[in-house]
């Protein structure tokens, strides 16, 4: 899915699993609270400066999507020569402002269902700073727990 958009070549979409090992209670539920990840805390993946923030867009009922605001509520952190996008955040949850310094692990917001998404998840991707915006720049691979994520990889926290 992300391969069609070069800056998102290494993008990762995180979903949560409930106690039954599935993403949501029910089959394609419309209730956002049915999704295991909805409302989960989002933390800074790196220390740096917040360079972009958008908040106030509605959390949409699945499978509605906002194609005019693809990242929905989101923020961008500049760190270590990269721009890191954290997208589809919950309306009103963004806890930082543009220009604010953040530390790795600092709470930034909560997972929502805003933007061009069909169910709650956290989208993250990084581009090389100076090669364009977070939506047009040169994609950079991201490591999680020291490894490259692949489809259906499980990361426990």
Task: Show where each model-derived region lies.
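A residue-level detector for short acidic-glycine micro-motifs
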Residues: 16, 52, 88-91, 110-113, ...
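Zn2+-dependent peptidoglycan hydrolase active-site motif and core
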Residues: 36-37, 47-90, 95
